[in-house]
Amino acid sequence: MNITQRRSAGRRDSGARERLVLATRTCLRERGVVDTSSRLIAQTAGENLGAITYYFGSKAQLVAAALADELSEWIQPALDALSGSADPAVRLVDAIGALNATFEAQRARVPALLEVFVHAARDRSSHEPIAAIWTDVHVQLGAVIAELRARDRIARGIDPEAMAALIVAVIAGTVVHEAIDPGGAQHQQIATQFAALLLASRSGGAHS
């Protein structure tokens, strides 16, 4: 096989891999993990069953990659806002706004996001792609909160790492809430209320 043929084969390989991931994401949204079979994924992707093991090693690894992509697309706009150069309070509010916008535009993705949390609870490997994304979220949130505290914008008693974990818990809880009670308090209200409470903590006398 010459260089041109190898490059052509590489392009075909890349396309098949992407189709499998996209097909898996579609199946997860519509069927959930339990009812997403290898055969269904292959049929949806227009690939043969052997392609799953060829590109990913197993269906489990393919599902993990698909869930990681689902989470990454949902959370990346917020991460971009958090890592910006604006005032930390503005970055935090912008990140919340980005999450709200994605949530509103992609409500059909809520079932797949629920599967992300279930998968993360079952597979706690630090090398697992979903764990890597959550770690990035924690680190960036913690950095912004630490900067807010250093600038005396929030109470000094607030621990950045613990608050970052709490915010992630609120994010996950909001997804669950929207899934089981779509007519209840809206995600915009929940997110805005939480941010307001955090940013108001300095004036509330909770600092030490």
Where are these regions (language model features)?
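Hydrophobic/aromatic-rich alpha-helical bundle segments in the mid-to-C-terminal region
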Residues: 125-131, 135, 149-198, 205-208
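Short coil/turn segments at alpha/beta junctions that flank glycine-rich nucleotide-binding fingerprints
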Residues: 30-31, 85, 106, 151
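Short loop-to-helix capping motifs
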Residues: 58, 122-124
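N-terminal intrinsically disordered/low-complexity leader segments
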Residues: 1-15, 22, 26, 204-208
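Amphipathic alpha-helical packing segments from all-alpha helical-bundle domains
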Residues: 75-76, 80, 105-114, 124-151, ...
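Helix-turn-helix
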Residues: 19, 23, 27-65
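Hydrophobic alpha-helical connector segments
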Residues: 65, 76-110, 160-167, 188
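Short, basic, alpha-helical segments at the C-terminal edge of helix-turn-helix-like DNA-binding modules
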Residues: 68-74
